[in-house]
């Protein structure tokens, strides 16, 4: 386990985590997931604990929905990290098509798809809709489908990562690692609204860029120990080793430094918003938007040190 990423934000844990944990455990157990999938999202994985850091003020139902989404991510991630060990499960094309079908049809009683994971996705979408409303669920679903489109290209794209720069890698990593989905969840759960007035705002886009960069880099940093043993080539540490010629320890240190720099970048954006005189009413909206992502960064820096997933 590498050294923890330092982050001065004073994080809080959601007081509803025990209630959400109980409901989460019941739902996961009832889905009849494959044993390997169930193992990585139950018990010591502390999935609800992660969501409790990202969404410290969410009610129990919202925290549960967010936890189920995190479970979806982890199962999806492990399926492709260890695809060569897959015991006859769905091929990538079938998997991606199934997720897309669920996102498109979850509001109707569609046919039960062949992998229990799809019922986890269906349950997650239903819970997000109940907790956040139709507009939020539709936007989240749209971003999930965009992430699936990116994942379809990831397998081919990975063959070129020995030549690409870290900047180019990160520009696409945000798509297939679902950080764009996370940004949407943050604004609806922590921000409590769509922030529609900021949709085309360049400062909002700068905030998003920093948040997703930190999310991608911190995940790569903490997960390198397990990913280097698997077939996954999507990792900033590997990119730096291949492209820049760094040894493993130097590459890890660079990724960690880039995580710290991203936090500094976000602080600078926040300070510049406060000092700008031309933003008008958008200034407070931008500050609120930025603030809704702070817990995510805290969780991304902290949770990996608390779970057995990265050990």
UniProtKB/Swiss-Prot annotation:
Gene Ontology BP terms: antibiotic biosynthetic process
Top-level taxon: Bacteria
Entry EC no(s): 4.2.3.36
InterPro entries to which the protein is assigned, alphabetical: Isoprenoid_synthase_dom_sf
Keywords, ordered alphabetically: Antibiotic biosynthesis, Lyase, Magnesium, Metal-binding
Pathway participation: Antibiotic biosynthesis
Reaction(s) catalysed (UniProt annotation): terpentedienyl diphosphate = terpentetriene + diphosphate
Cofactor(s) needed for function: Mg(2+)
Gene ablation phenotype (knockout): Mutants do not produce terpentecin.
pH dependence text: Optimum pH is 6.8.
One GO molecular-function entry: metal ion binding
Keyword Nucleotide-binding: no
Name of the top EC class for this enzyme: lyase
Pfam families documented for this protein: Terpene_syn_C_2
SUPFAM superfamilies in the cross-refs: Terpenoid synthases
Reported temperature dependence: Optimum temperature is 50 degrees Celsius.
Motif (DDXXD motif): 77-81
Role according to the record: Involved in the production of the isoprenoid antibiotic terpentecin. Converts terpentedienol diphosphate (TDP) into terpentetriene (TTE). Can also accept geranylgeranyl diphosphate (GGDP) and farnesyl diphosphate (FDP) as substrates.
Family stated for the protein in its record: Belongs to the terpene synthase family.
Assembly and oligomerization: Homodimer.
Name listed for the protein in its UniProt record: Terpentetriene synthase
